[in-house]
Amino acid sequence: HLLSRRQRQMCIRDSFITKRITRPLERLAQTANRISGGEYSLRTRIDSGDEIGSLSKSFDAMVAELEQQLENRTAFVADFSHELKTPMTSVIGYADILRTHVLDEHDKFMYADRIFKNAKRMENLSVKMLRMLKLSQTEPTLEPVESERIERGIRQMFENGENLDINSEKGIKILCDYNLLLTLLRNLIENALRFSDGQKVIVKIERSGNCCRFGVADSGRGMTQEEIRRAAEPFYKADKSRSAAGYGIGLSICKSICTLFKTELKFESELGRGTCVSFDLEVTE
């Protein structure tokens, strides 16, 4: 039974349409299988201009995001291991000296004190790491909080005579999670005090339109644009030669809390003049 000319044309057309649809889908499926096997750098790169092309672009964007997250996780683990290795090596070294040497009381105390301080460094690092992990699973409890209460909370956290000047506008009701906000402010203030070169750190709480603006300013060395861009990366330190303590985790915690509050950190800095970090929160009546 021979097909008519029209039927043959229809078969050819249908075959062309089928191949046009199935080939990109097969390519997409093959790429997905290879990616599931760990080849995260692969992309489908199907630019057909139709629904399949749109699906391909969304798929490639998703894989790119996944690849970036995996790279960030790998770098995070490597940085954490590096930061933990330094105090751990010190603890092992000083403990070995105490174990294998005959020392007088002064030297015993000196090495024991160094072990204690390095152990506290590791404890501090672990606490901040746990805090970051908890933040990724935290849902903020938003409630109206008066600016006076926030000011009191800051003063209670820094009641040991830190070089701190708090300028808070009265009567502002801020929609926030009070405990998370204090954690955010504590990390910003501690970071500013660390790099203020002994000068006063200024904290401002003031209304700005329909928002309340929180600002923490120091008069330290300032930051370059590259340092600002990377400031909230875990374990990033702008100047590794400085003796200031810290692991570069504080601003990462701040960024995570700002994300929960649906706001962002803003940096204004000038080299040799200092840095101001600010964020806005919604005001409620």
Predicted regions mapped to residue ranges:
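Short conserved segment of the HATPase_c
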Residues: M223-F235
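Single conserved hydrophobic/aromatic residue that forms the stacking wall/gate
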Residues: H1-R8, I12
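Amphipathic coiled-coil signaling helices used for dimeric signal transmission
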Residues: R34, D47, E51-N72
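Membrane-proximal coiled-coil signaling linkers
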Residues: L66-K117
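Membrane-proximal alpha-helical signal-transduction linkers
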Residues: R20-L42, S56, V63
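Short helix-loop "hinge" at the ATP-lid/N-box region of the Bergerat-fold HATPase_c
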Residues: A192-L193
